């Protein structure tokens, strides 16, 4: 089961009136924590039982753990509060670093703040 997380400066992610944009992240591109990259195309390839399908998520940031090179975790923007999914909450650390760089916090769907 995957958990949804949001990167926000607001007290509540679902009431964020001024969400972080990918352009803000781009301004700090040289400072991004290791493993993060900006992907302006945002086209994902997903393996299914029927072959490989593509999905366009628009410009995004992805994290690739050096110990898990076949797996990317995408932070989606799409005009909303940046969000990403993780199956294992113990893997939040790089996203907490990204949030700190943006003077923000990570919140789950229930509003619990992670630091």
Where are these regions (language model features)?
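Acidic (Asp/Glu-rich) sequence patches and key acidic residues
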Residues: 1-115
